[in-house]
UniProtKB/Swiss-Prot annotation:
Gene3D superfamilies: 1.10.3380.30, 5' to 3' exonuclease, C-terminal subdomain (1.10.150.20), P-loop containing nucleotide triphosphate hydrolases (3.40.50.300). Residues 236-442 form the Helicase C-terminal domain. Belongs to the helicase family. Hel308 subfamily. PANTHER family: ATP-DEPENDENT DNA HELICASE HEL308 (PTHR47961:SF10), DNA POLYMERASE THETA, PUTATIVE (AFU_ORTHOLOGUE AFUA_1G05260)-RELATED (PTHR47961). The lineage of its organism: Archaea, Thermoproteota, Thermoprotei, Sulfolobales, Sulfolobaceae. Its EC number is 5.6.2.3, 5.6.2.4. A motif (DEAH box) lies at residues 152-155. One of its GO terms (biological process) is DNA repair. It comes from Saccharolobus islandicus (strain REY15A). It is an enzyme of class 5 (isomerase). This is ATP-dependent DNA helicase Hel308.
Amino acid sequence: MSLELEWMSIDDLKLPSNVIDIIKNRGIKKLNPPQTEAVKKGLLDGNRLLLTSPTGSGKTLIAEMGIISFLLKNGGKAIYVTPLRALTNEKYLTFKDWESIGFKVAMTSGDYDTDDAWLKNYDIIITTYEKLDSLWRHRPDWLNEANYFVLDELHYLNDPERGPVVESVTIRAKRRNLLALSATISNYKQIAKWLGAEPVATNWRPVPLMEGVMYPERKKKEYTILFRDNTTRKVHGDDAIIAYTLDSLSKNGQVLVFRNSRKMAESTALKIANYMNFVSLDEKAISEILNQLDDIEEGGSDEKELLKSLISKGVAYHHAGLSKALRDIIEESFRKRKIKVIVATPTLAAGVNLPARTVIIGDIYRFNRKIVGYYDEIPVMEYKQMSGRAGRPGFDQIGESIIVVRDKEDVDRVFKKYILSDVEPIESKLGSERAFYTFLLGILSAEGSLSEKQLEGFAYESLLAKSLVDVYFDRAIRWLSEHSFIREENNTFTLTNFGKRVADLYINPFTADIIRKGLEGHKASCEIAYLHLLAFTPDGPLVSVGRNEEEELIELLEDLECELLVEEPYEEDEYSLYLNALKVALIMKDWIDEVDEDTILGKYNIGSGDLRNIVETMDWLTYSAYHLSKELRLDDHSDKLRILNLRVTDGVKEELLELVQIGGVGRKRARLLYNNGIKGLGDVVMNPDRVRNLLGQKLGERVVQEAARLLNRFH
């Protein structure tokens, strides 16, 4: 799999001088071995390639050269697809360089119920797999001009949640010109054949990686690290992770520690912080970070205070429970070497590029969500993603990745499974009813109408075994027909109006069916019932429900103000989801009743990032439910769902809906204005001095002008 280490001069590329200059202005004089091999395999001639290589090996520049070369020769549009919004933003900033030679670059994600007609004016579009999938369903004319696709992080095909969408997008994209980029995968030849692409596979890294396993010795407070080259090192300390962290810091390195849960990430960060007195920090830089934390509105006050106490010692934790704004500050501070240690959950390894000299993997086990009390070993791919963060180009001569085990007897097994083994082969994740039915609905929405043979042809283009396609295809057609999502006439399948609306809203057909049954079977209901119905769907958000909480939720079921729209299930798994949905509904009820964010976070034991994710998901689901109720002509429900959706979006009572239309006026400022007699747009315009006194001169003036603009638009 390794390539000859051949480096190519930038001047030897068959690209215009202005393109060469942009690359040189980044300080790049030579292409590294993976980049050189991609060029040799016809990257600049538009050849279809699958490039697999480790993190940090320069895959983005390969994509840039491929896109620019193709567009200069052929015109059209190029679409760069990533699995994460954070990566989309990162790539967008990189591609902005090409605007200096005339290419228009755009970024789009979220808001699935639109065709983004404005993108017709752009040449290079950066987006997510989900957003591109939703755009294809809307069939915008401009998308027909897209003739070059870059599929980034293609190993997400193996992700149980994201895999079906990545596969669906890939099936459509591989009918056009494409470049696929992936972390190292074991069955790359099979995937390349599926794509109709030539494989370019390499293990080359810009910084050599030393991998090892760390175990405790019988002698108290002594730990040995056995490295891949059979060398060993000993460290001493109260705790294995702390001991190796301090050892790395003493050599002026930065450290990423991975733990398997949020609580472990936070507690480990606190422990490490207690030992940071000897580490030299830039006090001015630390002070700037603390001021940044004070300036942002996102995030609970408790988590901010905890982070401030840690960051003052050069340490931070990082997990999905934190707000995006807090995570962004932590990541940027680490990149600039202001923070020395981050303790994170594995989600960080799959996200933005954030290398460190040393990576410590504190756990190879994680909780099994389906079986309480059980743990699973992490996949090899997850280990490779974490260890791949070790070694920062330009700063480190080597990167070190260490797995911590509890017993010396585990060393050999862990070494063989994670360090010496290939990652798991990529396999289709369309092999479930939920995934396959959604896939077919999306294909029909994008194509308009297809014969049975044509529709089946798309399914056969998946990675799913033909025998499984045959089983799922017949089931899917039958279920989608019986539930009025599709119709068949003259051996041609099309979507019903309801099916098309479901596809455009980008919700799962099982979600739509649950919503339809809940609404059609009941008269207009209360907020908690609507919220519970939507949270109970397959697209609903999941939250952790403790055993004590379960008992409280069961008691609450008896005291609700109205009848729920979902029948209480008998099966244990379904009942757990039923209680999960009730907790989500209660969180959202407090949110729309303007309960303070800190109170919500403490009451339900969630992070500010969790709350934001729940709000975004329920915003999408209330919006979808409103539009489905309109499609089904359930007017009693649609009136209530429209108001509920608006309240969920901003977290306000109905009386504030007019005020929160004003840019810069959120739930807190709207309540401040309302309680001081400013109850609508007209009041804002008629009382500018009072508004300025309440909000400050600068913001107040902007709010008055925006309110006047909105009033003019409405009249």
